[in-house]
Structures are given as structure tokens and as C-alpha cells.
Amino acid sequence: MRHVQAEPSPSSEPEAGPSQPPVRQGALQGGLLMGYSPAGGATSPGVYQVSIFSPPAGTSEPHRALKRQAPPTEGPRELKRGPGLGAREGLPPEEPSTVGLLGPEGLGLGLGVASQHFSHRGLCVVEQRSSVTSSWTSGTWSPPCPPSNASCNTLHTRDWASPDPGGHGSLGESPGPAPPGQLHTLDTDLHSLAQIGGKSPVAGVGNGGSLWPRESPGTANGHSPEHTPPGPGPPGPCPTKRRLLPAGEAPDVSSEEEGPAPRRRRGSLGHPTAANSSDAKATSFWSHLLPGPKEPVLDPTDCSPMGRRLKGARRLKLSPLRSLRKGPGLLSPPSASPVPTPAVSRTLLGNFEESLLRGRFAPSGHIEGFTAEIGASGSYCPQHVTLPVTVTFFDVSEQNAPAPFLGIVDLNPLGRKGYSVPKVGTVQVTLFNPNQTVVKMFLVTFDFSDMPAAHMTFLRHRLFLVPVGEEGNANPTHRLLCYLLHLRFRSSRSGRLSLHGDIRLLFSRRSLELDTGLPYELQAVTEAPHNPRYSPLP
């Protein structure tokens, strides 16, 4: 059983005029009924209230609409927009007019009816869903909308709200009170503008007769209503929509013309990731000489003053490395600083020669079979002795030079006193390879006549390859180390001199002095410590 209780009307005769709701015959069939109140209304001026309902399946009775009473007229009020403004101004809350639907026998619509209640004031849209057993009444519903003098006459609907030719409207209307938990704000799709039959139901509106901006229901500034939320309206009686720019996009306020944005200027220089033209094997040795990652990449065609300065600094850094790689033998320690350094460097930190003699390099292998014959001459001639030599080779091919051999002759088998020699004389050390062929004969002259008892010292004998004609004043950077002999001397408490500890040798894989085609010749240099020259025994 269906029952609808209608709101009693104060007058039995319908009033003609603008207070009559413009009800069309097809509104009942289409399930859409609209009420309109002109400007100057006392209770709810400028208000549309639309109710949409869905009848149950199989219901085909024609519906009739109740007429809405005309609200008493009242003087014009100040234009207020937005919910809650009337309450702040001290105005009493107002109730909009309602429209109801009745069946043929005065009965309401059946069970399962869902109604949607629309009030067009500041785009306030509320959906009401009734319960299954609730009866439909024409009670009033007061949205928190302030009064307005401007009456907007365009119904917000969609194209699918047109009347159904078959007489079964998919949408109907029947306003009524609903529980607060069943009020839902509809999606912004219902705010899209539509034209009824291609025309507006009212030609003009108040406030100077300005018209509502007409747009197609599917577009709003080139965007669909689903993706375009309503924005703040213009200074007119009706709100409008504005396009929202995507995130990260800023409007161009300087010019209205559309065109390509100006190209941003790129950075001047980047950061290098590796050396330009370097030996891959030498990276571990002279990587500290290369420019850091913050230095710019050098362009070969760059002729600017900055480019010339950078290339000049690069040449200063790499010049000692080029001379280091060109040498055929062992090289003297190169200068790692681009500024000029003294000809004689006394530092031993990081020295290639000292590192080899002290065993700081990891050996790559050992060779057995080398021997050394030791002899001396002077005030007396001690007996010659032959001792084995422990030969170790190293892999220093990143220096682009022949890998040297380190030979160590242990003198401990000769006793605690070592190999006795005169205080002034010559020491001869002959090195033999496993085939018993002479590799090199060293002759070292010494004079330790002023050496006190219980002291010690050493001699370091070097053989360099120097350019021909520069024997006397050869530049240390032009000398190539070929052989080295390190001897340790010690004086006993009685004043006798002897070789002790061990004898260390550095030699090349091949005999460089036999290569007559090289424009170099051998030069022997013997060095001893000074200041102090002798050190006391521990």
C-alpha cells in the first residue's frame, strides 16, 4: 500500500502569475519536476527545488503534481551568497517551497523509492534516500542557504533526464524529510549546465538582466565536468566555473598569446668521469695527479682564456708522467707538483727506490739459482766468499719500465762478526745468474778511517744511464737508474771494520750497458750518510 501525505494549501484556487511553478505535462512522465520562485519572494526568493524519484518496476500509473502555494511577497533584500551567510547577518532561517507528487487515488509511491532533493541556491545539492517503510510527506526541508534577490532560472540537470516517451519515467520527484544519515552530497556531475529544449525557461534574470553563461553539458572550458570542479564565480548573480590548471603549470600573465616557452640556457660545463687519454694500467699509481671530479671537461676547440688556463695546468701535471713512461730503465722519483722543485729531493716518503729496498712492494715471485761472490782489497785482502742470492721480482709494468729484480745476500752464515774488510779499500761484488753467467760486477771504493769503535754506517752505490756528454752536470731528472748496491758497515768495540747484516742489490732483467745503440752511457755515483755520518750501535 502506498500513501503520501500532502502539505495543506492555504488557498483552494491556484494562483496565476510568476509564483506558479512552471510544470509541464511531460514532467510527470519524465520523472522531473521543477519549482521556480521569482525575485522578490518573501520566504525563499530565487530558489529552485527539484525532487527526483524512481518508481518501482511495473508501475505505470500516470502521476499528477500538486501545485505549490505562492509565498507572500516581501521587500527586496540584500544579495547574500554562500551557506551560513544569513545566520551571520542575523536573518532567520528560511524554508524553501516544496513540490510533491500524488498517485491517482491520492496514494503515494510504493516501496523502494529513492528520491533526490535539489535546491538551487549557491549550487547546494542534497540527495535523500528514504527507508523502505517510510511514508512520503510534503514536509519542508531547510538548507542552510541565505536569501538572494537574484533568481537563477537554469535547471542543473543532464541530457539523460529527458522525458521517457514510453510513459515510465526513469526519474521522478517526491520531496520529503529523510533521516540525517541519508543525506549525501551529490557528485559535481549534477552541476553541469543543460539547456531545456535548446532554450532557457526564462529569458532574463534580475540584477540588470544578466544572463547565465551557457555551456554545453559535456564541456567546461575544454574539460569534462567530471574533471572540472566548480570554482569561485564572477561578480554576477550566478556562479561560474573556472578551469583549474594541472599541478606544476603556472598561467602566463605577461602575454595572452600562446607560443613555445623560451628555451632555458644550459649549464656551461659538466663534470668529467675519467681521464681523457691515459693508460688504464697507470690509474692506480698517478690517479692523485689527475684533476678531481669538480674540474670541468676540457674541450679541444675551446680557445677562451679559461680553457687555455685549464689546459696549461693539465700539461704541467702530466709532463712528469710522460717522461716517466718514456724511460727504458728505472726512473728517479718524479715530481708530483706542477710548481718547480729543487733538483735534489731528500724526501724518502713514496720513493720508488726506497720502497723496493725495504720490501714495501708485494713480490710477484722468487727466482732461485742466483749467487754472489764477495771480495775486498786494501791493507789486506780477505778471502772471497760465494753466497746464495734471494731474487724477487715485482710487477710494476704500469710504470712502463722494465720490472727490476731485488737480490738479498744474507751474511749471517759468515758468523756474528760478518765479512771483515779493511778500513780503506775496495769491495767487489759479482752477481751470477742461475747459468753462472756474470750479470753485473760492482766495485765500490770506501774510506772509513775516521769511524769510531762501536758505530755503523752504510754506502749506496748507483749506476745511472745518462745522456752522452752530460757526465759531469747531468740533470737528476734525465738519469735512469740501472743498478744499485747497498752495503752496511759496522766497527766492533776493538775498532775492526766488517760488512754485516745483508747486501741488497737492484738490477734489471737485461744488461743495458751492452746496448750500444742507445745515446746513453753509465755513470756511477756512491753516496753515504752525513750529519751524522756514523751512528752508534744499538
UniProtKB/Swiss-Prot annotation:
List the residue ranges of the region (Disordered): 1-103, 156-185, 197-308
GO cellular component terms, semicolon-separated: nucleus
* InterPro entries referenced in this protein's UniProt entry, alphabetically: Atos-like_C, Atos-like_cons_dom, ATOS_Transcription_Regulators
Spans of biased composition, class Low complexity? 1-18
Which Pfam families does this chain map to? Chromosome_seg, DUF4210
Q: Ranges of Polar residues compositional bias?
A: 274-286
Q: Where is the composition biased (Pro residues)?
A: 227-238
Recorded superkingdom: Eukaryota
SMART domains, alphabetized? DUF4210 (SM01177)
Q: Does the keyword Nucleus apply?
A: yes
- Asked if Nucleus is a keyword of the record, the answer is yes
Give the keywords, sorted.
Nucleus, Phosphoprotein
Residues modified to Phosphoserine: 254-255
Q: Where is this protein primarily located?
A: nucleus
Subcellular localization, as worded in the UniProt entry: Nucleus
**Region called Transactivation domain 1 (TAD1), residue ranges:** 436-444
Give the record's family classification.
Belongs to the ATOS family.
Name this polypeptide is given = Atos homolog protein B
> Which gene carries the instructions for this protein?
ATOSB
